[in-house]
Amino acid sequence: WIMGHMVNGLEQVSEFLNLGANAIEFDIDFDQNGVAKITHHGIPCDCGRLCTKQTVFTEYLDNIRHVTTPGDPKFREQLILLALDLKLQRIPVEKAYAAGVDVATKLLDHYWQRGKSKARAYILLNLPLVQDYEFIRAFKDTLKNEGYEQHNDKVGVNFTGNEDLDETRKVLKKVGVDKHVWQADGITSCFARGTDRLTEALKRRDTPGYNYAYKVYAWTLVKYSTMRRLFRLGVDGVMSNFPDRVVEVLKEEEFADKFRMATYDDNPWKKFTG
């Protein structure tokens, strides 16, 4: 999976897909009551990137629905996963539940359209910190209460804050999640990062019966050398400001026979066993 990073402007969707991404990550900014308002990262962000692009969240969902609906004039077959970077760290922790209700409701209304939409992308809910676990509970409660639990098949969760992996596992168990789990590891492209935690996450992914890391990805990669190093470790995906660079590396002799771009037929909630 190659995730285009910080795709918050509508015009950026095609830009990152044209560069080779098959997934996009966008930031969800909330008001202090937990209402999802806009796609917006804000300052600071990655070196060399403009942090200020934004779109009304519901408008973004309406647009991306078209892009991920087969038969729609805007359909782009390669876009198979949407990663929602939930900026919950900017609101009081007690509002995490309200935020989960709001995001689920807006996905129901504007992306899935309560059964009318044929939009098919997988959804990855990226939470910054384990303290925000009530968002997950609220999201699932809302789908259940509204009668649309079938959408859980397309939804996964992921914690992005580089916290202790055992704490992550405990929190996921607390909210009853033991499948559809990704594990991120990374840092802004402005800095270098070691691979100890990433290696441990990969080890857990490859442990039979471990259900809290079906896929492991690294963020945010810009250097060719870093991409090569992490591919050698066996990551399932990367997030990058330059998807075209990732595509280039994947075509190199060392990796061409070991990796390929994920397609819609690849299940993101299933461990790859070769």
From Swiss-Prot:
Subcellular location: Secreted
Positions of the catalytic residues: H5, H41
Cofactors, names only: Mg(2+)
InterPro entries: PLC-like_Pdiesterase_TIM-brl
Source superkingdom: Eukaryota
The protein's Enzyme Commission number: 4.6.1.-
SUPFAM superfamilies referenced in this protein's UniProt entry, alphabetically: PLC-like phosphodiesterases
Disulfide bond annotation, renumbered to this chain: C45-C51, C47-C190
Protein name per UniProt: Dermonecrotic toxin SdSicTox-betaIIB2ii
Organism name: Sicarius cf. damarensis (strain GJB-2008)
